Structures are given as C-alpha cells and as structure tokens.
Amino acid sequence: MADKITYITNLQYAQAYRVSASPRDWMRFMDTASRMYRYSFNDQLLIYGQNPNVTACATLDVWNKRFQRWVNKGSKGIALLDETGGTKRLKYIFDIANTHPGYNGEEPYIWQARQEHLGMLLAHLTETYSLPDASSLISVLEQIAEQVAEDYTDDALEGN
C-alpha cells in the first residue's frame, strides 16, 4: 500500500507541473476541474491525471446512498490522498460513467459555466487571485497558471 501512496503522491506533483506547462495544458486541466469543483485542487490534479474525461465523481457510499446508483462490477476507482488524522491513506471515487441507476436512482446535477456569467467569473477570479489583467478569460487563466506553477515549484523545492 505504501508503494501506491508514493505513486499517487508523485502523480499529484507531476500533474501540477504538467498542467502549468502551457496555457493549452492549463485549459485542458480546467475543463476537467470545472466538472470537479467540489474537490480540492490537489484532488482535481489526481482526478485529471487518472481520468481527464470524468463528468461527475463521488465515493461508493455517496453513489449508493445519496443517488441510489451502483458502481459497475470491475470498475476502477480514482485514487485520492486522504491525509485526515495525520496518516496518508487512499480513498477512491468513481465517475458516473462507471455507475448504473438502482430503483429510483437519481442523476446528479452537472454544473455548467455559461457565457452570461463570464463577467462575474472574471471579476471573481481577478479579485481572488489579485490579478492585474482581467481583459479575457485566457489572460486570467494564464496568470492563475503562473501563480499555481510558482507555488508548487516552491513547495516541491522545499520538499513539501
């Protein structure tokens, strides 16, 4: 199990470098992250690294109890790091594509960004990340990618 935890930890750092390599890589990551907005940035990196085409993810328990959906036999979960309690462990989530509805099963609500919200989105990102240029979504995302890359580079060099 320790080998798997090490592998997933290394995958997280590798994905941080990968997605910040260029605006195009960042946009690909953001496409996945936009569907995984309830997950932390680190979890989003791991989700993207293991299955960039996910639509909606949840734990086995959430699929079963909240949505009355069942994970298909043989489905491979997406490993995330769980560091609660001071010990690194793995927890697994599954994409909706790997589930099927049970009796009265629900479809989860899938969030979407709409053109009419672009102004509010730009304003929010500009304020949240203290960005100097909010002329376009591409400009804003490039600036955020630079900040994230710098943060993760510093953390990696410090050994965090």
Predicted regions and their residues:
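N-terminal accessory/interface modules of nucleic-acid-binding and processing proteins
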Residues: 1-160
